[in-house]
Amino acid sequence: WPCSPTPLPTSGGIHVSCLPTTLTEDMDVAVLGEGERTICELMEGFAIYGFFHKQKLHAIDGIAYRENGNLNVTRPRQFIEPLDNIPFPARELLNTSAFGNIFSSRGCPYSCTFCASTRYWNKLRFFSAEYVVAELKEMVERYGARRISFYDDLMIADKKRFEKIADLIQKEPVLAKIKFGINARANLITDHTAQVLKAMHVNSVGMGLESGNERTLRYLKGGSVSVEDNYNAVKILHRYGISANASFVIGSPDETREEILDTLHFIKTSGLNFVDTFVLVPFPGTPVWDYAKSIGAVSDDMDWNRLNIYHPKAGYPISLSKHVSPAEMNELCKKFYHARLKIAAKSAWTHPFFPAMVRAGMANVANRVRRLGAAHAI
């Protein structure tokens, strides 16, 4: 394929896939949905013509593009089945380090109000256990990974596959000293699950616990999990020596200040190792976006900077809260931030990834110094 002297202006991801009308004039093409086959077809056309030939783009499924000022959206791209047909990522093109990441599935069986995963992927699909372990081995043997995080929405969604992955990992000598991190849900964390995670060398689990208030939790997660489940998940993980990390969402439309403080209390008393808290943002493709659109808070042609809850301009970011003013929300965010810092300071020294994080940071600094020295020598 010929090399382009300038970047090819192409976009993709959940936002433009859910709202193709937001494709900006400075982008030639948007890849909608699953992108591997689509981007290959785009590049094959580019290799022939040296540019994205507008008269040929209509034959490529799963894209949006503008022609003479008009937006064209082609037929939806069919999902790749099975996912094992996808080659391993060419990680040599990336800045690899001792910290690697992997996706072993696409999609999520749940439908949280603030998350677009279910709508974007439409259904839950898995790479086979054998494929996943083969990719893990390549990451270790070829790229030197020592800590690997599963970035799936819910890696343990299929219990049998999850247990098979754990079993295969234990049979591979090259993976014997590798530590893993995964994402999970509180209602799926049982003693048996934690035992399997421990045997699989998982020492860090991230969970979207979202709230310490029952009513808010039902709004965000549809009643599939309780505050008691959240507490129990942390206790079970700690019982097996696994770090419990969590994220929370505050600022739901009908959430009161007292209910937000319930979440702060949970964070302070649950024993979590690391915490992130976010203000609810109506991202495209989510039920929250649909609600925000119904009340006129957002639109397809809005100023997208308004979705930045940390925008410095007072009153500029969109807030959906009916009971907490932007100024009050800002003060509450400071409380959560201070709680996060306190937990992080307490946990950092004992976090399973901390030694490797220090080594990776030092190696990164050393590499930067070497590059600067080489540039100066030239």
Question: Residues of each region from the PLM?
Answer:
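Radical SAM [4Fe-4S] cluster-binding motif and immediate context
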Residues: D84-N245, H265
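Glycine-rich beta-alpha loop elements in corrinoid/cobalamin-binding modules
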Residues: W1-F79, V279-V281, G285
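Short, well-ordered beta-strand core segments
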Residues: A30-V31, V205, V275
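A structural micro-motif
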Residues: P7, D28, G69, A176-I178, ...
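Conserved strand-turn element in the central/C-terminal portion of the radical SAM core barrel
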Residues: N183-N187, G212-L217, K221, V234-E259, ...
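Catalytic cores of alpha/beta
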Residues: P20-E25, T193, D254-K268
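C-terminal accessory regions of radical SAM enzymes
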Residues: A64, S243, E258-I378
